[in-house]
Structures are given as C-alpha cells and as structure tokens.
UniProtKB/Swiss-Prot annotation:
Gene Ontology terms: cellular component: plasma membrane
Protein name, entry field: Polygalacturonan/rhamnogalacturonan-binding protein YtcQ
Family membership: Belongs to the bacterial solute-binding protein 1 family.
PROSITE patterns per UniProt: PROKAR_LIPOPROTEIN
Source species: Bacillus subtilis (strain 168)
Subunit organization: The complex is probably composed of two ATP-binding proteins (MsmX), two transmembrane proteins (YtcP and YteP) and a solute-binding protein (YtcQ).
Pfam families: SBP_bac_8
Lipidated sites in chain (N-palmitoyl cysteine): C23
Residues anchoring lipid (S-diacylglycerol cysteine): C23
Primary location recorded for the protein, binned into one broad class: membrane
Membrane topology annotation: Lipid-anchor
The keyword Cell membrane is assigned to this record: yes
Residues making up the signal peptide according to the UniProt record: 1-22
Length: 498
C-alpha cells in the first residue's frame, strides 16, 4: 500500500463527523428524513477494507449520484479494525456511520449501554426496505433488547456437503439423505475404488482442524446437537454437555477409526483439506457449500463432477443445520456526530435507498456491460475478462452493504447457482443459538480460553487418546474454571431480555 493510503488510514481517529447538510425540501420530507431534490447529504463513514486497495472513485461517484449524497469514506484495514475502533471510541471522535464488526467487544458494549449511539428500533418501520429486514437477524444484533444499528447481512447458514457425483455414479450409489447413508458412502469411497484406477488410494471424508466450519458442527446439527447452547425454561446448557455432542464425536471417531476420513484431521489446515479433495484423494467435503466452486476449479481431474447437498436426516428423521448470527456486525450512528433525529432519519433513508435494486446492483454486481452482463429473468453472467475490474472496482463495496437483496442470480456457473439456492433453502431448517443476542462478561473475557479446554478434549476423544469419562472430567474442569459463571450470566441476561 502506498504512503498516501497509509496516511489516509492513520487519520481514522481524527474527527470525521461533519454535520449533515440541511434539507431544502418541505417540512414533511424533513420529518421523514428524506432530502429535498437540491440538498446533497454529506455522510462520513468508517468502513472496513477487506481488500488490498479501496474501490476506485468511479463506482463511489455513481452511488453518490443515485443517492444524492457526498460520501467521505475512511477505509480501515481489516487487520487493525478493532484497534482503530477502540481508539476512536475512547477519543469520542467518530464519523456519522461507524462499521462495528464485533458488537460484543467490551468497549462497544459499554458505548451502546452508555447511550453513545442512537437506538433505531422505533424508526425502521418508516422505511420500506429496513422494515423488511430479517426479524431473526435483527434480534441477533440487539443489545439488552435494543437495536443500535443496521445489520450487515450474511447468510444464516451456508453449511452443507460437497460430494463427488462421478464417484457416486461409478459405484451406482444414490445421493445420501441420512447420516447412515453418508457413512456408507464414506466407506464405499474408501473401499470400493470409486475412481476406478485399480488402486487403493481414496477415502471418504476430508476434514480439518476446525470444529465450527469444518465437518464437526455440521454433522452435529444433523445429529440434533443444539447450536452452541440449548435453552429450556430459562436454563442454558452448552452444546458439549448434550448427548448429541457425544453422538457426533462417536460418528467422527468411527469414520476415523475405520480409515474413512483423514486420520490427521486435527492438524490439517483448510488448504490441505481442500487439496485432499481437489487432488482426487477424498470424495466428501463438509463445510461452506460455496467451497464447491474452489474445489472444482483447483481439481487435478478436470472431468470431476460435484453435487452439493444441504439436507441430511438425523436419527429422528428430522433435517436441521446450524445457523450463524446472520450478520457481520452493524452500521451504528453516534450521537456525537449525528446530533438530531432529523439527521438520523436522513441516514436511515440513505440505507433504505441503497437497498433498492439500482443502487444495490451497482454496489454488488457493478456496471452492466463493464463488470457483468444482465440477462433476462433476473439473471446475470460475468465474463472472465470482467472479473479483474469487478474485483478492484466493485468487490470492496460489499463492506458498505447492509441488506442482502440478491436481485440477480448468477447463471454462468451451475455450482454457484446451486449454492445460492441451497443456502436460501437452509433457512427453512436452521437451528439458531438462543444466546446469540445475549451478553456474558465472562464469556467475552475468558470464552476463548475456556473453549480450548473443550476443543482439546473433543479432538483427543475422537482420536482415541481419552475415554468418555475423561472427556466428562474436562467438562467439569470447564465448569469449575469459569463455565458455571458463563451459564449463570446467560440465564440472567435471558431473564432480563424477556
């Protein structure tokens, strides 16, 4: 990154909060937070930069034109976003729009609770797109039952299975629909020469050292395991204290013991996991369904045929999949720089506007004919020659998007189309975390430390280093080391939120 950008990014902690331009429209439009035809709204914005360079001005200028705004965006590199945010909160120098990714950061929680940011729950009903925001995700980003920002939407669940369809066909196997059938496919992929090369060189599942985004948590949801926490009558139980968690460990242990998955998965990276699949050694991948595109693109066998599965029946015959919070933080509005209700309404009107098809399409797909090609029936394609410009001009703008409207479907890639359709279908079977919107100070301070106790015990059990009773001892250690306090704090927060 050049010196110019370094200097620009360092100034985040300086004041960026100019007062919004006055409205020249009628009193009616002012009350509704809508700018008059001749009044440009000036907005200062702290945004997160997930790419090497900020987007070029061309797209920004188009957004300003469509929304009648002047955008003063400070791009903060992803690696330093928390430090810069904490410094800005401490100094009290904040722009009008603040991107907050970790809403349970202790500094952020204190800022919300102290009244530093506007509470917008009573306002969004006046804006048609904001009023249609997903109610579950809105609940997930509340703090003490209050909504302090517009969520940055992400899919609630992208988890599923990528499987070698050509291997299924070679062995005359049907697509698995239950956990038992999935196990039998893993066995056949290991023992029955699915690639028909006459060699004993394949196995079923390729997994990695990730109990969340690898296979474990998704298989757990198929088993009926709760998503992080189980709530019953106001009492909270962590997932690893349930029988379904042990059933998941036993399922994975059985796969490993019989050689139907890579034995070294606790020390396998995601790159290594994907290489095992792409190089034709494994035929089952469990994780983010969009990874199917990358697995295919890096395949050593270009004739590889893949299928994506999102529904697997558990022992009780039900289909489930675990859900994330459905967000990547919020856009929040500090009272120090958004001084009046009228100014807040102007900003809310802006976010409502960028959810409309013309602005959203510009920020997501780019300029028709330059970054993509719009087809009929709400579809689009992107040529290889258009990808680079889209990546540099448009992709960084995803950091500015709140509501994911997905007006167009990409028909240029059947695998990506399948991923999008199945991700949408997942919303019908998701299992949410009942503690998602709750706050525990002990969890915030010591959660990662305590989680390591359980993670280590889980891996050790699955590879046969400890017994079930020894695993239970580690759970007791978690409780005595602070886990009981976390449970109590969640139960109290749940009671207060009702």
């Amino acid at each position: 990154m050049g010196n110019k950008w370094r200097v620009l990014l360092i100034v985040l902690v300086l004041a960026l909060g100019g007062v919004l331009a006055g409205c020249k429209g009628t009193d009616q439009s002012s009350a509704e937070g809508k700018a008059g035809p001749d009044s440009k709204v000036k907005l200062s914005w702290m945004a997160i930069l997930y790419h090497q360079q900020p987007p070029k001005d061309r797209a920004i200028k188009e957004i300003e034109k469509l929304t009648n705004t002047e955008l003063d965006i400070t791009w903060v590199p992803d690696a330093v976003k928390e430090d810069r945010l904490n410094a800005a909160l401490a100094a009290g120098n904040l722009p009008q729009i603040v991107t907050i990714q970790d809403i349970k950061n202790s500094s952020v929680m204190n800022a919300f609770r102290s009244g530093m940011f506007w509470e917008i729950g009573d306002y969004i009903k006046d804006y048609p797109n904001l009023n249609k925001m997903n109610k579950l995700i809105n609940k997930n980003v509340t703090i003490d039952g209050k909504l302090y920002g517009i969520y940055r939407e992400r899919p609630l669940s992208r988890q599923g299975i990528v499987i070698r369809k050509d291997w299924l066909d070679n062995l005359n196997l049907k697509t698995p629909k239950t956990l038992d059938e999935l196990y039998e496919v893993a066995k056949a992929f290991t023992e029955d020469d699915p690639d028909k090369d006459g060699k004993d060189d394949t196995f079923g599942l390729a997994d990695r050292n990730d109990l969340i985004y690898g296979a474990f948590k998704t298989i757990g949801s198929y088993e009926g395991m709760p998503t992080d926490w189980k709530e019953s009558g106001g009492k909270f139980t962590p997932d690893f204290m349930t029988q379904e968690y042990k059933d998941t460990m036993n399922y994975m242990k059985k796969l490993r013991d019989n050689g139907y998955m890579n034995k070294d998965f606790p020390v396998t990276s995601k790159t290594q996991q994907q290489e095992l699949f792409s190089q034709g050694k494994a035929g089952i991948y469990i994780g983010n369904m969009v990874d199917a595109v990358n697995l295919r693109d890096h395949a050593s066998d270009k004739s590889m045929k893949l299928e994506i599965i999102n529904r697997i029946k558990g022992p009780d015959g039900k289909e489930r999949v675990w859900a994330s919070g459905g967000h990547n933080g919020v856009f929040a509005f500090p009272k120090t720089s958004v001084k009046t209700e009228a100014e807040l309404k102007r900003i809310l009107a802006f976010f409502d506007r960028i959810a409309e098809e013309d602005v959203y399409s510009l920020m997501t797909y780019g300029i028709d004919g330059v970054h993509y090609n719009k087809g009929e029936d709400k579809t689009f394609t992107r040529k290889e020659s258009q990808v680079k410009d889209w990546q540099t001009d448009i992709q960084p703008l995803s950091a500015l998007i709140a509501i994911d409207k997905a007006y167009l479907k990409n028909t240029g890639d059947p695998l990506r189309t399948a991923y999008e359709e199945l991700t949408e279908d997942n919303e019908k079977i998701i299992v949410s975390n009942p503690a998602e919107s709750l706050y525990s100070a002990s969890e915030s301070e010591r959660g990662d430390e305590l989680k390591k106790i359980i993670d280590d015990a889980t891996y050790k059990y699955m590879i046969g280093d400890i017994t079930e009773s020894q695993f239970d001892k580690e759970v007791e250690k978690w409780e005595s080391s602070g886990g009981k306090q976390i449970i109590q704090e969640y139960e109290e927060a749940f009671k207060q939120a009702k």
